[in-house]
């Protein structure tokens, strides 16, 4: 059996983007994170798993309460670096959406996905 812990469609407001105006005014980001554990959760013990609240706290710290960056790729990497510190995590999948990304004309959804696996 494989155990995956997730946080889906967590919407936050933050100031990140390639253009100066994006780093000055908050805009929505929608983050989904899935982490696969190294082994099954055999005990009814929160210490033997990944607390999904920790995923939300990681987003808050790395996306909302951090210095502005230009790329969603950088934000995904920051989340992976943080979550992968948990030795129980074998792999991580992150999807980040930017609903109000500045496209040349209406339509589309800006999305970045990153995956990480422990060596």
Features from the language model and the residues they span:
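N-terminal, polar/charged subdomain of small-to-medium soluble alpha/beta proteins
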Residues: 1-119
